[in-house]
Amino acid sequence: MLKTSIALGFFLTQSLPLNPQVQGVANHLIGVMDTREQAQTNPRIAKVQMTTCAVDFSPKQDSIYLYQEQAIIDRLNQPYRQRILVIQPSADNSTVESKAYKLNNAPNFINFCNKDLTERELNVSDLAESVCTVFLQPIAGGYRGETPPQGCPTNARGAVKITNTIILHSQGMDTSDRGYDSLGQQVWGAQDNVYQFRWQKP
């Protein structure tokens, strides 16, 4: 799996003790996954690459900051989604919280994970609004996460809210994000299937 080069600096620079589950979720997300395998058997699934890496920014002892981008595999220089993920204990310490933020000046961060960790600098001013939170709990072999019951607000492609369920497991991640309009009708996203992101092989 294509994780070592992206993750190594992260492991070497972590000096503060973290909630083991917070660390576990972050470790699982870091690396490169794609939907290539699923797309080969289902032509309706786009070939998408998801790249996630640690950033040089730790304002809170019990949180880990990650940069994540998603792009069509043949257009990696044009990601359609760029986020900062803050992985931390939830307010009541019952789950792990993954809180996603948009970025100011997002084009400046394209292919951010190709840089060395010491060059992946993030400032508070780089963070725009928070867009969604997923709450994760450990399951056999990984973690399961969901958005709040009411979903997260959005204005993407005719939807006013999104919901998502993710499963982190030994082969990668399964995700089923869905967008709903003001009448509660699904307007985009997973139907009966889930999006299957799998670790890239070296």
Swiss-Prot record:
InterPro entries: CpcT/CpeT, CpcT/CpeT_sf
Tagged with keyword Lyase: yes
EC number(s) given by UniProt: 4.-.-.-
UniProt entry tagged with the keyword Lyase: yes
Xref: Pfam families: CpeT
CDD domains for the chain: CpcT
Keywords noted in UniProt: Lyase
One Gene Ontology term of the molecular function aspect: lyase activity
Family: Belongs to the CpcT/CpeT biliprotein lyase family.
Record's function text: Covalently attaches a chromophore to Cys residue(s) of phycobiliproteins.
Name the record gives this protein: Chromophore lyase CpcT/CpeT 3
